[in-house]
Amino acid sequence: MGLPWYRVHTVVLNDPGRLLSVHIMHTALVAGWAGSMALYELAVFDPSDPVLDPMWRQGMFVIPFMTRLGITNSWGGWSITGGTTTNPGIWSYEGVAGAHIMFSGLCFLAAIWHWVYWDLEIFCDERTGKPSLDLPKIFGIHLFLAGVACFGFGAFHVTGLYGPGIWVSDPYGLTGKVQSVNPSWGVEGFDPFVPGGIASHHIAAGTLGILAGLFHLSVRPPQRLYKGLRMGNIETVLSSSIAAVFFAAFVVAGTMWYGSATTPIELFGPTRYQWDQGYFQQEIYRRVSAGLAENQSLSEVWSKIPEKLAFYDYIGNNPAKGGLFRAGSMDNGDGIAVGWLGHPIFRDKEGRELFVRRMPTFFETFPVVLVDGDGIVRADVPFRRAESKYSVEQVGVTVEFYGGELNGVSYSDPVTVKKYARRAQLGEIFELDRATLKSDGVFRSSPRGWFTFGHASFALLFFFGHIWHGARTLFRDVFAGIDPDLDAQVEFGAFQKLGDPTTRRQAV
């Protein structure tokens, strides 16, 4: 046929059977990828430390999505929460992966069948005997079925009425587990961080979809609208479908990057804004202040800070710290976190407590500056010793650790103090194993960053695809030179402009 690569899809333009076939094959590829990727991730995933080496630090991409829908156990005998399990059954990570691969195989066979048996009676118009699809009716059927699935997910799966529920956690990502969720029908249901909104919105949207589907099945579009929106043209379907997909892609890119109840930090890692706003740091200080108010010692209050909470307050877990072309998981960057060293408290020789100014997200290097409680600079690590007034040596800065592995240990040696001051720029200080994975020490992004980048990029691409195909279908007559209302038989090649009798070719 000799079609250029960008026009090959014209082979299914007026062939409903093979159009169905290629879509089934596409579903086979998507489901096959999902199942295969899940098996690969399960092969390389280490579930031994859910606190310091969670799935998002290891670069898992599909495991978090399975987990948020209620899958927590593996045939390997482990649970995502760190415990063990004996009989996970079919609804395990491997079971879901296998189901996707089996479904992919069935779709593959169905695609071949529909490619071979493309000329089915169901695709033919009874009046003309030519292949034809009743697109408004198909739209109604699909809308109805999508509404049923949406309603079922919200009313049964999420609520736990017939299903496991979804992953729900506290605002600081410490107590997450799979549980049933009651729908939130009040104004709180519109809060993107309230899990009840997921149930209520799916129930509401599903109900609307069912009603809209029944409407489109029972009411035919007016002729003017049918012609104006080219409802008989399959490219109209392509254009509007692309619109639905790019809109959804933009929405999920936003909910992933900015965070929501659908993207828990235990599964996808914290957001960059939690570092920017000192979100976890504030909670840690709140707990410390509450402990001190109860006359507990600094050592006691810092020892009660959960290691998980301290680990979130570390810049290496900020998804915006990854760079372009830095492939690999976070563990391949700064290493595998082994343990929390504790919270360093710096003091000058006057006994003032000093705080290290933290590195902003988009800096690779940042001056080491120590300020007092009033924000006045008291010490730094100078760039030029000759100009220094506030160097660690001159000011006599010491550091003492509270909580963690170095609890109660103090240092006054300037070299050691400066080392920990530099590390305190990056948040809480952790011991990191860079040898095991040959980690290069350069920060990587988390799956939160990859998902956002991928979906935002494809959404932009699909936006242009929507404009392109929408324009093609709306202005097809202009582009082709054929009046869509032309009833006369047109002889191709008789006119210089197709269908225009004033441009009849003259025999030479």
From Swiss-Prot:
The keyword Zinc-finger does not apply. Its main location: plastid. Pfam families: PSII. It is a multi-pass membrane protein. It comes from the Eukaryota. GO terms for biological process: photosynthetic electron transport in photosystem II. It is found in: Plastid, Chloroplast thylakoid membrane. Keywords: Chlorophyll, Chloroplast, Chromophore, Membrane, Photosynthesis, Photosystem II, Plastid, Thylakoid, Transmembrane, Transmembrane helix. One of its GO terms (cellular component) is chloroplast thylakoid membrane. The chain crosses the membrane at residues 21-36, 101-115, 140-156, 203-218, 237-252, 457-472. GO terms for molecular function: chlorophyll binding; electron transporter, transferring electrons within the cyclic electron transport pathway of photosynthesis activity. Binds multiple chlorophylls. PSII binds additional chlorophylls, carotenoids and specific lipids. Belongs to the PsbB/PsbC family. PsbB subfamily. PSII is composed of 1 copy each of membrane proteins PsbA, PsbB, PsbC, PsbD, PsbE, PsbF, PsbH, PsbI, PsbJ, PsbK, PsbL, PsbM, PsbT, PsbX, PsbY, PsbZ, Psb30/Ycf12, at least 3 peripheral proteins of the oxygen-evolving complex and a large number of cofactors. It forms dimeric complexes. One of the components of the core complex of photosystem II (PSII). It binds chlorophyll and helps catalyze the primary light-induced photochemical processes of PSII. PSII is a light-driven water:plastoquinone oxidoreductase, using light energy to abstract electrons from H(2)O, generating O(2) and a proton gradient subsequently used for ATP formation. This is Photosystem II CP47 reaction center protein.
